[in-house]
Amino acid sequence: MGMRMMFTMFLLVVLAITVVSFTSDHASDGRNTAANDKASKLMALRNECCDNPPCKSSNPDLCDWRS
C-alpha cells in the first residue's frame, strides 16, 4: 500500500469514528433529558411535601430528618 492509500484509510477511519460518536451522543441526549425531568419532578414533590408538616411526618425518608 502506498502512502496515499494509507492516508485515505486513516481519514476514513477517523470519519467513521466521528460519525458513530456524534450519533450516539445525540441518542443519549433524550435519555439525559428524561432523567433530568424526573429529577426535577421529584425535587418539586419533595419541596412541597417537606413544607407541609403532615406530609413531612408521613414521609420521613423523603424529607431531611435533621431539619
Curated annotation (Swiss-Prot):
Cross-referenced InterPro entries: Conotoxin_a-typ (IPR009958)
One cellular component (GO) term of this entry: host cell postsynaptic membrane
Disulfide bonds: 49-55, 50-63
Compartmental location: Secreted
Propeptide: 22-46
Gene Ontology MF annotations: acetylcholine receptor inhibitor activity; ion channel regulator activity; toxin activity
Signal sequence, start to end: 1-21
Tissue expr: Expressed by the venom duct.
Classification via Pfam families: Toxin_8
Lipoprotein found in the keyword field: no
Segments of this protein annotated with the region Lacks the Ser-Xaa-Pro motif that is crucial for potent interaction with nAChR: 51-53
Domain-related comment: The cysteine framework is I (CC-C-C). Alpha4/7 pattern.
Name of the protein in question: Alpha-conotoxin-like Qc1.1b
